[in-house]
Each structure stands twice: as C-alpha cells, then as structure tokens.
Amino acid sequence: MQKKIETVQTLLEALPFIKEFRGKTVVIKYGGSAQETPQLKEKFAEDILLMYLVGIKPVIVHGGGRQINEMLDALKIESKFIEGQRVTSKEVMRIVEMVLSGEINKEIVSLLNSHGAKAIGISGKDAHFISAKAKDFSRWGLTGNITDVKADVISNLIAEKFIPVIAPIAAGGEMGHPGFNINADLCASYVAKAIGAHKIIFLTDTAGVLNNSKELFSTLTKAEVEALKADGTIHGGMVPKVDACLEAIEGGVAKAHIIDGRIEHSMLLELFTSAGVGTQITI
C-alpha cells in the first residue's frame, strides 16, 4: 500500500508542471549516450511518449557524430576537424546525409512509433525548411551556418499531431546543391527560436554546467554564463552547448536546459520535479 501511495504522490508532484507545460512546444536536442545505448533509447522513447500524451508538443533534433565517424572510417574516407567543427567535403557530405537522414533519423522515428507515438522524420532539405550558407568554405567546406528556418513547416506538422524528428542538414540556395552539414546544437536552437518553443533541452553526457569543484549549477542567467565563460569555468565542449542555449533564450525561448542523458528518464525529472536534474539557463 505504501508503494501505491508513493506512486500517487509522485503523480501529484508532477501535476502543477503538467498543467504549466500542457500545450507548450519543447525542442529536444537528442545526442550522446542517450542516442546510442539501447536501454537509454527505450527510456527516451517512453519520456517523449509521456510528454506527448500529457499535451506537451515535443520537437526532436538529433546528432550523430559518432555514427558518421564510424561510417567514414569503414569507407576509409578521411575527415578532419578545425576548431571542433567537421570539415565537410562533398564526399563527406554524402556520408553525413546518408547517416543522419537515412539511418539515424529513421531509427528514431521507428522507435517512437513502435511505442505508440506519431513521429515523422525530416531534414532541413525537405520543403527547404532550413536554409544555410557556408561557414567558411575555404576552411570547413560544406559545414554551414543557418540563415533561415521556415517555422510553418514544423508548426503544420505539430498541428497535425505529429512529433517532428529533424536531421541537421540544411538546403543550399542553388539547384543541385549538396546541402550543408549543420551543428545539431545550433540547429536545435534555431528551430526553437523560429517556432516559438517554450523550452529547449539538450541531452548530454555530463550532469550540466559544473563549477570548478565539479558541483552542478542548477540555475544560471545569461550574465552568469558569460562571466563563467570569461573566467574559464565554462570551457571546452561545454562552450558550444551554453552558446546554443544563449542563442535560444536570446531568440525568445523562455528557458534552456542542459541535462545528463545518461540518467534514465532525465527529461521527465527535469520537467516534472521541483529540483530538476540539470542546469537551467534563463535571461
């Protein structure tokens, strides 16, 4: 009986948050271990389905760097990085699109649909809903910066009760252009801004933003993030994550969250509990 009472208490604790977020759009950047470990994939699908069933409108943007590297290695195609960004030749771009749009995207869609969701997979090339230009073609090739997002493409899918699953590939301007490889974190931020999302959540392989004693910051403002970047507390791979958060909140998204995707049901813990489990960033 006690266990049943505790279950009800858990549901009651979540109720105010369900009321608050019902009808709101939440963009999720899906990557890291959560995207690669079979058990975590299942938990992710369960979380998305629960969010969907209580009236939240999830939009998923996924990465796939490890899988791209594995395919390039298998095909013996060289791939370099400059300042942490992949140099995307035309040959590499073909593999990037094949892995992101043809393999990973379809796997996520199938996983969600097998759990009873109504997911649909697209890339930024579909309906040219994400346009981009070269970041610096002489250095990074077909690695791009987003110039435009057609929000109505996603809004129309949401209105039809679909869960959009987006591969971070953007269209080029010219006919026959091979497209652009887009950083998935920034792709998620630009999509969140364009569609007026209430929240954006980044699933990572770290607990969130940590101080120099490896303790978690539960909440940070934009000014605090900038100060922590300036003094070196935020460094390395966390810098592009917080930059993507700032991009989103500066564009009107109410809150950005960096959470540990290695924790089962971390999205539900962040959304539906008072304490949360990661770092929340606000203006």
Swiss-Prot record:
One MF annotation (Gene Ontology) recorded for this entry: ATP binding
Subcellular compartments: Cytoplasm
Keyword Hydrolase: no
Family matches, as SUPFAM superfamilies: Carbamate kinase-like
Reaction catalysis annotation: N-acetyl-L-glutamate + ATP = N-acetyl-L-glutamyl 5-phosphate + ADP
Biological-process GO terms, alphabetical: arginine biosynthetic process via ornithine; L-arginine biosynthetic process
Pfam families per UniProt: AA_kinase (PF00696)
Entry EC no(s): 2.7.2.8
Protein's UniProt name: Acetylglutamate kinase
